Swiss-Prot record:
<dbReference type="GO" id="GO:0009055">
    <property type="term" value="F:electron transfer activity"/>
</dbReference>
<feature type="binding site">
    <location>
        <position position="42"/>
    </location>
    <ligand>
        <name>[2Fe-2S] cluster</name>
    </ligand>
</feature>
<keyword id="KW-0813">Transport</keyword>
<dbReference type="InterPro" id="IPR010241">
    <property type="entry name" value="Fd_pln"/>
</dbReference>
<dbReference type="InterPro" id="IPR036010">
    <property type="entry name" value="2Fe-2S_ferredoxin-like_sf"/>
</dbReference>
<dbReference type="GO" id="GO:0022900">
    <property type="term" value="P:electron transport chain"/>
</dbReference>
<dbReference type="InterPro" id="IPR012675">
    <property type="entry name" value="Beta-grasp_dom_sf"/>
</dbReference>
<dbReference type="Pfam" id="PF00111">
    <property type="entry name" value="Fer2"/>
</dbReference>
<keyword id="KW-0249">Electron transport</keyword>
<keyword id="KW-0479">Metal-binding</keyword>
<keyword id="KW-0411">Iron-sulfur</keyword>
<protein>
    <recommendedName>
        <fullName>Ferredoxin-2</fullName>
    </recommendedName>
</protein>
<keyword id="KW-0001">2Fe-2S</keyword>
<feature type="binding site">
    <location>
        <position position="50"/>
    </location>
    <ligand>
        <name>[2Fe-2S] cluster</name>
    </ligand>
</feature>
<dbReference type="InterPro" id="IPR001041">
    <property type="entry name" value="2Fe-2S_ferredoxin-type"/>
</dbReference>
<feature type="domain" description="2Fe-2S ferredoxin-type">
    <location>
        <begin position="4"/>
        <end position="97"/>
    </location>
</feature>
<comment type="function">
    <text>Ferredoxins are iron-sulfur proteins that transfer electrons in a wide variety of metabolic reactions.</text>
</comment>
Length: 100
């Protein structure tokens, strides 16, 4: 099992946290375990509540998501509830209004 540094940021929400996330743990779960107040609803990758935006680093594996289309995935949108890290990365949280 590999572990990666996942940085979650959102200036408006006061979030700037560096997490150690195992490759078998979702980014949302890791953030919640660290005490962050992150948005979520379905926890299955089929809504937009947990949407984030990849700012830098390795794109997470989110094969289980059903909301984003190929163009949105290519643009760096992330469903944190089903996103597993594949390398160090930085993700801006609370982006539901931007992805819609």
């Amino acid at each position: 099992m590999a572990t990666y540094k996942v940085t979650l940021i959102n200036e408006e929400e006061g979030i700037n946290a560096i997490l150690e996330v195992a490759d078998d743990q979702t980014i949302l779960d890791a953030g919640e375990e660290a005490g962050l107040d992150l948005p979520s609803s379905c926890r299955a990758g089929s809504c937009s509540t947990c949407a984030g935006k990849l700012v830098s680093g390795a794109a997470p594996n989110q094969d289980d998501q059903a909301f984003l289309d190929d163009d949105q995935l290519a643009a760096g949108w992330v469903m944190t509830c089903v996103a597993y890290p594949t390398g160090d990365c930085t993700i801006m949280t609370h982006q539901e209004s931007e992805v819609l």
